[in-house]
């Protein structure tokens, strides 16, 4: 815990002033002038309290040692086990820019459009449970430099003949992608982290544990190599698209560009922490999440459905459907069969899509971080 040099009170990171604030005497301090001394940059570890949920095994870090009363990941109301640990320092951190009040306001605006959501999700006491958590990310810096040799062609028609001319296209490539980011926590769903993006990397600062005071941090347990291929693929896809739209090669149909032709290379991988306001909702064995980007205020929520509200909405929707079916009695038999077939296929498609989506969420089949952890067991 950080203590005020003036009165000994507890210091927390104040989002509004972007400085450390004493809760007792209201004195402000520079986050980089506290606690770690001149050797902070040379110290590769920092001391934290690790809280572990006895139900789901999820872990969060804190510079404070006050007991955490609930788990952000599974929603369980329980006292988390704690221990002191030495954690590896990330290279950079984006401090929280959006306050808890701003987070709650953004969430409330989102909930106005969620007519089938359970009423508990609008309860002020529930919304007040938003917890500020720094999520670990890997930031990849990727370069593409070298000579470029591509095969292109142009097709034209001359009388009864279709003529295809082949060309050898050359050029010099110089591209650089800064900070392609992927979350480094198996507890943080990849889909949520992707939808919360982007973060403005200009807001990154050198890491100091002072920024964690008053907040929590998730543990980093997914290796950078899990996402390195994805980062290089993203860079290659973006470069390929730009080459195709470049005026130099306009009018040419190019063969598929292979990654090795672009000289894609990962130059640097930085460990970072990005701010997320996190809220979980537990109903029996189901857990849903609402998250807010702590820098931009973007809301990403997996909002559950209240069966009673949904049933009422379905009954109201049944009225125009009944009218449609009544009108269908006047259709020709062939038209009626075709309409019924199309509606049936649409229903089957929606049902299958939802089944696959639920299965992927339950098993984490499309989450690279979770699959990585499972492969280690």
Locate the predicted segments by residue.
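Short linker/helix segments within small regulatory modules
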Residues: 13-20, 61-69
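Short functional micro-motifs and their immediate structural scaffolds
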Residues: 10-12, 30, 61, 79
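Residues immediately within or flanking Cys/His clusters that coordinate Zn2+
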Residues: 1, 17-19, 46-50, 68
